[in-house]
């Protein structure tokens, strides 16, 4: 991995126009006619078409190519709960990746709300603007509830990147690695060092590919997650092992 200094990173974000993303027009705007089509009076016609048929928004606006990257800053990369505004550079960075690799337009939205219900309400109210929602850097277990609720209440795709993006990439790596060494995915034993959103989602996808639940050992900050431990959330309970002989990753006990 390339080593990046603090000075270089700050200079990158500060130089020229601060930040990493911007909005650019996609239609002509040089003449009075252009502006009259883009705004008043011409803009009234697509508005009325959308009023008659909401799906027309995909024909006359950028809705279909516009994704909201939304976070409350409670689990930002390796920084933890640093707050919504502090996470903005990460959300802009994700917007940059959407654009350069997928041609998808992004608005980064930082919501200063930790309560899952209120956070969902905020997203639901702005959802008509977008063709998709990318949830980003929201801590577990709240992120599981938020994603499931928004999938139920919204009529556009909802993805929690820390769960599903990570899971897809790591599952591809696992599948290819097992193919290279000639091992059956149904017979391998898997140790998952972590029990946050990414780890939970990754492990569920590994199981969908064939990893057997009884062959999984998952750890969190307190050690191996066992079924006799109190205070586990529902996600951790699902992966808790019934083994009573193992609480750490001592080689002898794992073997």
Q: What residue spans do the PLM features occupy?
A:
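N-terminal ligand-binding/catalytic initiation module
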Residues: 1-158
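Glycine-rich phosphate/diphosphate-binding loop of Rossmann-like nucleotide-binding domains
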Residues: 77, 84-102, 160, 168-250
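Acidic, His- and aromatic-enriched active-site or binding-groove loops in soluble protein domains
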Residues: 163
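Conserved small/polar residues in nucleotide/adenosyl-binding loops
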Residues: 252-255
């Amino acid at each position: 991995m390339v080593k990046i200094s603090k000075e270089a990173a700050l200079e990158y974000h500060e130089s020229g126009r601060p930040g990493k993303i911007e909005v650019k027009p996609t239609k002509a705007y040089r003449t009075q006619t252009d502006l009259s089509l883009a705004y008043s009076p011409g803009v009234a016609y697509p508005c009325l078409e959308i009023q008659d048929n909401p799906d027309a928004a995909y024909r006359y606006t950028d809705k279909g190519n516009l994704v909201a990257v939304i976070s409350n800053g409670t689990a930002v990369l390796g920084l933890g709960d640093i707050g919504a505004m502090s996470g903005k550079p990460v959300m802009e960075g994700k917007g940059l990746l959407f654009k350069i690799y997928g041609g998808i337009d992004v608005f980064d939205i930082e919501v200063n709300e930790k309560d899952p219900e209120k956070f969902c309400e905020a997203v639901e109210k702005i959802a008509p603007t977008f063709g998709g929602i990318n949830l980003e850097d929201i801590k577990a277990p709240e992120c599981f509830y938020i994603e499931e609720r928004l999938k139920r209440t919204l009529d556009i795709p909802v993805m929690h990147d820390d769960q599903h993006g990570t899971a897809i990439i790591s599952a591809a790596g696992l599948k290819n690695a097992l193919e290279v060494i000639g091992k059956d995915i149904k017979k391998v034993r898997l140790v998952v060092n972590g029990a946050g959103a990414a780890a939970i989602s990754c492990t569920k996808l590994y199981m969908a590919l064939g990893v057997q639940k009884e062959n999984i050992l998952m750890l969190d900050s307190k050690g191996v997650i066992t079924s006799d431990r109190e205070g586990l959330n529902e996600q951790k309970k699902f992966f808790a092992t019934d083994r009573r002989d193992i609480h750490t990753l001592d080689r002898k006990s794992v073997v």
